[in-house]
């Protein structure tokens, strides 16, 4: 059977049209289920689903310790440092007997690792539906992270609950914490330098992000790459090809991040630079990495630095205060804009065996220090004391 060109073109057009309809319909269905997200846009949320949010939460049991944690975004759809840290802290606190509910603007899944997640509408927390309001009323503590501080307090002051603000970045509107905000206020800083920059008008604690380093403690066989993880502008994505061009004999690896625009133009990169897509398992990447670089403009800690140091990988960092606090005695740093410094330090580590050995030893010693810290235990004690102090 011979099909004419016109008929073939018509069939192809109908096939494409059907495919587009199916994809659009699928997006709509996934959106209504709360599991569709495109890029960095906030997922669509139907009024029907929002009205039912948290209505299924059971009444608080006698003796139950309950936290309602408000965030802009959460895992699994955003795998940035503060979201991963919150996931780790929540998992630890659950083991300590806390019940925790998460509220997010960017709602994608209704549950993650045993934690129920409910949607809130951006900028309209004060107009939350009945289920969310009852959840606030039942809480021992309301926590906030990466959420506008003033908006948070305006929305929850009526419930007279203690509010714990988790500060992870220098960009949070911290000036709001210089004043009395109505509800009893407490602050959890993720690094010392952010606390030192603030007014410390409220009781607070510093809790560094905790990384389970055991799976990253391994011996390497002939690692060859200088690696940058997350190629956005803030992390150093524009600087990476410049360094690679200056060191043509050394192999560089850029791992695409899971958020923000990635600077990974293949046509502009030197031949000794390889880009890879976002990775879910970083063990293989670290096994192939001889030196990790972190030329970040702003970084309050450095989860990837900790993961890399666990295997003795030297890490060259910018002079961002959070990174310097993170690497501690293993510091190997450059001003972010000083290209010659990055080139010099990388070349020395990649070609001088003694320099590499000494830096590797310091990385492992720093991990021993971090592994000894019991900061999540202190967080549990801090929160338990707050709940007891304000119990009715």
Regions found by a protein language model. Give the residues of each.
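Conserved acidic donor-binding segment of nucleotide-sugar-dependent glycosyltransferases
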Residues: 231, 331-339, 348-353
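Conserved catalytic-core segment of nucleotide-activated headgroup transferases in glycan assembly
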Residues: 213-269, 275
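Short hydrophobic beta-strand element within catalytic cores of glycosyltransferases
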Residues: 314-317
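Donor nucleotide-sugar binding/catalytic pocket of nucleotide-sugar-dependent glycosyltransferases
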Residues: 184-217, 234
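Short alpha-helical donor nucleotide-sugar binding micro-motif in glycosyltransferases
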Residues: 278-279, 284-289
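A charged, aromatic-enriched C-terminal amphipathic alpha-helix characteristic of glycosyltransferases
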Residues: 354-384
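Short His-centered aromatic/hydrophobic patch
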Residues: 144-149, 167
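Aromatic "clamp/platform" in nucleotide-sugar-dependent glycosyltransferases that forms part
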Residues: 297
């Amino acid at each position: 059977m011979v099909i004419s060109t016109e008929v073939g073109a018509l069939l192809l057009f109908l096939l494409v049209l059907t495919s587009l309809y199916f994809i659009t319909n699928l997006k709509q269905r996934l959106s209504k289920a709360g599991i569709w997200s495109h890029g960095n846009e906030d997922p669509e949320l139907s009024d029907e689903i929002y009205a039912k949010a948290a209505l299924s939460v059971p009444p608080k049991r006698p003796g139950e310790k309950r936290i309602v944690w408000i965030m802009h975004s959460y895992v699994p759809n955003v795998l940035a440092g503060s979201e991963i840290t919150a996931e780790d802290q929540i998992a630890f606190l659950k083991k300590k007997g806390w019940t925790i509910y998460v509220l997010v603007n960017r709602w994608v899944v209704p549950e993650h690792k045993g934690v129920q997640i409910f949607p809130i509408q951006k900028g309209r927390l004060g107009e939350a539906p009945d289920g969310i309001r009852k959840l606030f009323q039942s809480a021992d503590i309301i926590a906030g992270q990466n959420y506008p501080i003033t908006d948070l307090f305006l929305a929850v002051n009526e419930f007279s609950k203690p509010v714990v603000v988790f500060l992870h970045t220098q960009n949070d509107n911290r000036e709001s914490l210089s004043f009395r905000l109505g509800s009893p206020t407490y602050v959890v800083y993720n690094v010392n330098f952010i606390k030192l920059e603030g007014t410390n008008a409220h009781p607070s604690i510093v809790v560094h992000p905790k990384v389970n380093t055991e799976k990253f403690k391994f011996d390497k066989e002939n690692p060859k790459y200088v690696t940058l993880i997350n190629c956005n502008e803030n992390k150093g994505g524009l600087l990476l090809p410049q360094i690679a061009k200056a060191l043509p004999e050394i192999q560089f690896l850029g791992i695409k991040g899971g958020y923000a625009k990635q600077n990974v133009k293949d046509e502009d990169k030197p031949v000794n630079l390889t880009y890879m897509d976002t990775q879910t398992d970083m063990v293989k990447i670290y096994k192939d990495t001889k030196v990790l670089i972190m030329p970040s403009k702003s970084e309050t800690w450095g989860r990837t630095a900790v993961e890399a140091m666990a295997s003795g990988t030297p890490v060259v960092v910018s002079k961002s205060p959070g990174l310097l606090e993170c690497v501690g005695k293993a510091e190997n740093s450059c001003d972010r804009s000083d290209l010659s410094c990055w080139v010099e330090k990388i070349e020395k580590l990649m070609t001088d065996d003694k320099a590499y050995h000494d830096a590797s030893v310091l990385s492992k010693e720093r991990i021993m220090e971090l592994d000894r810290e019991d900061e999540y235990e202190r967080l549990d004690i801090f929160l338990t004391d707050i709940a007891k102090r304000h119990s009715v």
